[in-house]
């Protein structure tokens, strides 16, 4: 474990863990940057949409929050991220968003934005719907319960040459059994794969205090990360040796907000339809007794050449 000293009511643990920094946030919009790299790679050693889920949520949520009346508490109810240029394996990405519709009478709004890489190429497009809520701020969770924030150690990635000749289903079965490393990002979010078959996976993730937003629930960007990881794994169960996949989008409806000090979250991802080049995927995050928390949809490009070195 790595310890980072946190001044009371100072550093936001969520953004500290995810390497995110605030550049600006005002009525004109919000801008954040994130240092991406191996700590946020999937099991293939690649940066994915899930790697930038938190900074994406920060941007669209921050833009709405900054546009709302002072003192408001806000939550994102729907988050959509669409891939454009490949995300870099390492470096700096910048997420910026602004409010495109604001209805203070009903307490709702729509924000749009984008993520750009270090070369100023658009790597992802963002859209969110947010609401003003009356929930109390959970400062003791959002800013950490103690003077030190413990950051989980970075987990390993299985060398690409050990995976290149394997069918995708075998790789994902290996992750479930522990023969293949689940990757740093899954390790960071606590995503554990428990059962696998072609076109379906199930597992769980355990919330942690560092994942908290201002109202003490798991930030939507963390949930996007988990949903994207699950969608990628189920897409990989369809791939042949020497080929891989790329998730092209993530569309999340955030139905209920899981508490960071709550029970494990169940994760189930299924292929709805798969063609030769594209798979449509649905992922559900639920409570242990089956109550829906997140409904997510994704599409994944299949048949891409295997590349374990990121982009």
Task: Enumerate the predicted regions with their spans.
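Non-catalytic linker/capping segments at the edges of enzyme domains
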Residues: 1-39, 137-208
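Short coil/loop residues immediately preceding or within conserved phosphate-binding loops
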Residues: 17, 76-78, 110, 188, ...
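HotDog/MaoC-like acyl-thioester-processing domains
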Residues: 62, 74, 87-92, 100-165, ...
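Hot-dog-fold acyl-thioester-processing enzymes
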Residues: 6-10, 14-17, 28-63, 73, ...
